[in-house]
């Protein structure tokens, strides 16, 4: 008769994640591709439990935020994924974004899901219940305005300018528009000859100061 058969019993779903640093941070001004990885994982018990033979499929879903989350990319296959060298059963992937997924002022929710190679149809990760990654896509520069000193003002020894004041606002503003916010404001001061470098007008090169 036939000899013994060895097989792996695997009912554990794989896991997937996004690896773009800017997506994890939450604010993006350029996103030509979304990158990530999926791993066929072994169950935690019993000790020494095995896993099936890697990843068979990875999908991504992107939603945009209006009054509520609205799916703009239904679950769709990513491209360029395969098992990494060394038999790690970790597959990397990339997804090329399109115009509706990169509109400045929009907030997006990115989710991934994967399927492993267990027979007959693979264990599927439940992507719908994942928290995902929320990002704000912002390519508009902020607006700023100097409050004091006033434009074309004339100031002398009896009215010295010791403090500069200004406002900065992330742009555009409005209902349903999301922005990254102001990270920092810088100023440069020029006396028609040199730039202020912190202790005098000593720099012929442009100097921006925090």
What residue spans do the PLM features occupy?
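Low-complexity, disordered linker/stalk regions enriched in Pro/Thr/Ser/Gly
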Residues: 1-210
């Amino acid at each position: 008769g036939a000899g013994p058969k060895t097989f792996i019993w695997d009912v554990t779903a794989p896991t997937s994640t996004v690896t773009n640093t800017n997506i994890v941070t939450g604010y993006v001004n350029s996103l030509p591709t979304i990158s990530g990885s999926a791993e066929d994982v072994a169950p935690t018990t019993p000790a020494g439990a095995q896993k099936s033979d890697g990843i068979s499929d990875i999908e991504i879903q992107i939603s945009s935020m209006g009054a509520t989350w609205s799916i703009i990319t239904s679950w769709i296959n990513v491209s360029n994924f395969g098992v990494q060298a060394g038999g790690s059963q970790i597959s990397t992937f990339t997804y090329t974004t399109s115009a509706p997924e990169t509109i400045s002022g929009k907030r997006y929710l990115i989710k991934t899901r994967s399927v492993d190679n267990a027979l007959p149809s693979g264990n599927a990760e439940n992507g719908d219940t994942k928290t995902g990654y929320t990002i704000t896509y912002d390519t508009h520069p902020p607006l700023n305005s100097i409050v004091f000193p006033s434009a074309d003002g004339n100031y002398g020894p009896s009215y010295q300018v010791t403090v500069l004041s200004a406002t900065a606002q992330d742009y555009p503003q409005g209902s349903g528009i999301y922005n990254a916010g102001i990270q920092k404001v810088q100023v440069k001061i020029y006396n028609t000859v040199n730039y202020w470098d912190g202790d005098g007008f000593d720099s012929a090169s442009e100097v921006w100061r925090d």
